[in-house]
Each structure stands twice: as C-alpha cells, then as structure tokens.
C-alpha cells in the first residue's frame, strides 16, 4: 500500500479540506447545519446600508449583507486567516449582494451603468471598478495571497463583463498597527493617510466610479481611508460594500436602511 509523504498529506488537507470550515465536522466546505446558522445572520429583507457610530467623515455609503456574528464570523475568519479558501464562493455570493445594493443605491452609478461611462471619453475599462481594501505586504507574504482580492474577483463574476471589474488599485504606503483591540478613534488614527492608489491604476480610478470593498465593517476607519485615497486620485463616485457589519455596544455599526429593491 502506498504511504503518502507527510508534506503531501499536509498539502492535500489544505487543497481538499476534510472538515467544515465553521464547526470542523467531517466533510469539505460548509456543512448543512452551518449554512443554516450563517443564514440566520443575514439582514431580513436583503442587504442594507450600515452606518458606524460614530461615523467617520470619509466613509462613503456602505451596504452590508449580514451581521458579523456566530457561524458567519467564524467562516470569515477561517477564510481569511486559516487558509480555508473553499469558503470563498459562499462569502463571495454575500459580498456580491452588498456590491449590487451599493450600485443600485447610487443614482450616479446607475446612470453610469446605463450609459457605460462616468466622466466621458474612451476607455477599455468598465464604468465601475470594485476596489478591495489593500493588505500590507507582510500580510500577503504570511497568507500567501490577497484573500479579499480573490473574494472580490469571485463576487463580480455574476455582473456583466462591460459593467464591473475588479481593480487591485490601492496599496498600503506606511506601516500600521493591528486594528484588533482599538476603539473608533484609535482605528482612525492608525490608518489615517496610510493608503494610496497604485500609479498604474491612477488614470482608470480618475474616470471610473469605485466600489471599495472589505469583509467586515467595524468602525468604518479602513473603508473610510480607502475611500479618501480613491477620492484623492480623482474618482468621480465612491461607495462601499462589505459582507457583514459588527454590532457593538457603546458604538458600532447600525443598520440605516434596506437597500432599494432588496437582495438582487
């Protein structure tokens, strides 16, 4: 009988996970019980606008699909930090709904999609760019990839090819501390002026509407900084989308309204 070398076994266990990403029960991906548990975190009626309290000055309108809690919180963490990329399609479907809600919720973007242009002129780019919040170089090295870019790429597959494209257009320009454990003010000061548009994307960002995306909306500091960097590069319109929003006592994200038209 063939005995697979230990490194091969370790590789296969990552490539073909043999346990639910949430509860660790047998079977790859996400088990039926955990799918139900994740669904319980979804906003009733579909994606809605979420607003942190206090709300950062630079934060654009942000739509989310669910609360960051329970099984969904564990799935997001497993995908991002534990290498469980097999949960990506499930999370991407939730992110796609939030992106769609942000597109529908902004009149200027609706008009841009209808006319296939934002600021005029000829461009090979679609009128809307989905821009993931950037990871630091250290995070990319540690994880081996950029999980949010992968997630955004999966999320836009259901949109028309001439409507929306993913743009890894932002980069971190200075060192920032881990946001965990910081309050709203601490998070804002930590990421303030920490991002910039990559030079090769500057022209496209300057003429396209942008949807800046993240996995979780907490205080809004990160999405707000990303939006600031895009505006500084001239983007005519910027909105935001995230899979889920935290619900924190004494200051956190609060649902503001349901997205027009509900879930796509």
Q: Which residues does each PLM region occupy?
A:
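Glycine-rich phosphate/pyrophosphate-handling loop used in enzymes and phosphotransfer proteins
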Residues: 1-264
């Amino acid at each position: 009988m063939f005995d697979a070398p230990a490194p091969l076994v370790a590789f296969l266990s990552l490539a073909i996970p043999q346990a639910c990403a949430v509860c660790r029960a047998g079977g790859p991906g996400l088990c039926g019980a955990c799918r139900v548990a994740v669904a319980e975190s979804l906003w009733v009626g579909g994606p809605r606008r979420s607003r942190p309290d206090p709300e950062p000055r630079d934060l654009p309108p942000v739509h989310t699909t669910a609360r960051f809690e329970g099984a969904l919180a564990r799935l997001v963490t497993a995908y991002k930090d534990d290498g469980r990329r097999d949960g990506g399609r499930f999370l991407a479907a939730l992110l796609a709904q939030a992106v769609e809600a942000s597109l529908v919720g902004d009149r200027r973007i609706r008009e841009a999609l209808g006319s296939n242009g934002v600021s005029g002129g000829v461009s090979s780019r679609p009128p809307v760019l989905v821009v993931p919040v950037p990871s630091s170089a250290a995070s990319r090295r540690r994880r081996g990839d950029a999980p949010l870019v992968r997630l955004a790429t999966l999320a836009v597959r259901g949109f028309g090819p001439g409507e929306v494209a993913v743009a890894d257009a932002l980069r971190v320009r200075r060192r920032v501390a881990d946001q965990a454990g910081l309050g709203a003010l601490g998070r804002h000061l930590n990421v303030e002026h920490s991002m910039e548009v990559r030079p090769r994307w500057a022209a496209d960002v300057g003429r396209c509407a942008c949807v800046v995306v993240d996995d979780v909306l907490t205080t809004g500091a990160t999405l707000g900084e990303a939006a600031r960097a895009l505006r500084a590069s001239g983007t005519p319109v910027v909105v935001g989308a995230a899979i889920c929003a935290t619900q924190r006592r004494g200051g956190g994200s609060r649902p503001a309204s349901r997205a027009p038209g509900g879930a796509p």
